[in-house]
């Protein structure tokens, strides 16, 4: 069924969440064993913390950046990167900030929440490598603070990214969700929009999601990497 939809679709949108990353070893902060368990995320990853509790802010993001060192995309990422060249994928909308899609070679990534793999100075805009946090050098030569290029609590999502994601979603005839609990707004609106505009909706996630009743196909309790590899083999058969 899915292979038929993939081959017949004119425009495909992939939507990925934390479940895509966890199979590469990236912690899922929304799970019971997640990154922020026991910590208040709004006290660590917020505009307020950046402005008024900077040491804790820096320590938190240093920990996250260091935790991504050595993490590599699993084979499912490679499948998606290959599909970009073989199938009409218009975008990979992701809730993740880890940059693993780009690392695997994907070129049509729309990171809704920004990227932790980029830093920039809030004063002059100069870009920096993440090594500046690892070596504890969070200030620019101009004196400005260097921050991760992620969307913090208290900030709005990038309007250009949102607009492009919405346009591609409305144009899609197949919308494939991979590893998202679909509980975070406004990201969880995209599958609804796709369905309302006539797309086939496929949800692949370890647990149930609130949008499962809308889906044309739901797959649970399966590794996303394995699912993508098996689907790819079926496409090549």
Swiss-Prot record:
Listed PROSITE patterns: SIRTUIN (PS50305)
Highest taxon listed in the record's lineage: Bacteria
SUPFAM superfamilies: DHS-like NAD/FAD-binding domain
Coiled coil regions in record: none
Entry-linked Pfam families: SIR2
Subcellular location per the Swiss-Prot or TrEMBL entry: Cytoplasm
EC number(s) given by UniProt: 2.3.1.286
Catalytic activity: N(6)-acetyl-L-lysyl-[protein] + NAD(+) + H2O = 2''-O-acetyl-ADP-D-ribose + nicotinamide + L-lysyl-[protein]
Binding site for NAD(+): 18, 22, 29-30, 95, 98, 113, 180-181, 205, 224
Active site, UniProt feature: 113 (proton acceptor)
Limits of the Deacetylase sirtuin-type domain: 1-237
Any one Gene Ontology cellular component term annotated for this protein: cytoplasm
Binding annotation for Zn(2+): 121, 124, 140, 142
Keywords: Cytoplasm, Metal-binding, NAD, Transferase, Zinc
Binding site for nicotinamide: 29, 98
Coarse class of the protein's main subcellular location: cytoplasm
Cofactor notes: Binds 1 zinc ion per subunit.
GO molecular function per UniProt: histone deacetylase activity, NAD-dependent; NAD+ binding; zinc ion binding
Role of this protein: NAD-dependent protein deacetylase which modulates the activities of several enzymes which are inactive in their acetylated form.
Family: Belongs to the sirtuin family. Class U subfamily.
The protein, known as: NAD-dependent protein deacetylase
Organism in which the protein naturally occurs: Halalkalibacterium halodurans (strain ATCC BAA-125 / DSM 18197 / FERM 7344 / JCM 9153 / C-125)
Lineage of source species: Bacteria, Bacillati, Bacillota, Bacilli, Bacillales
Gene: cobB
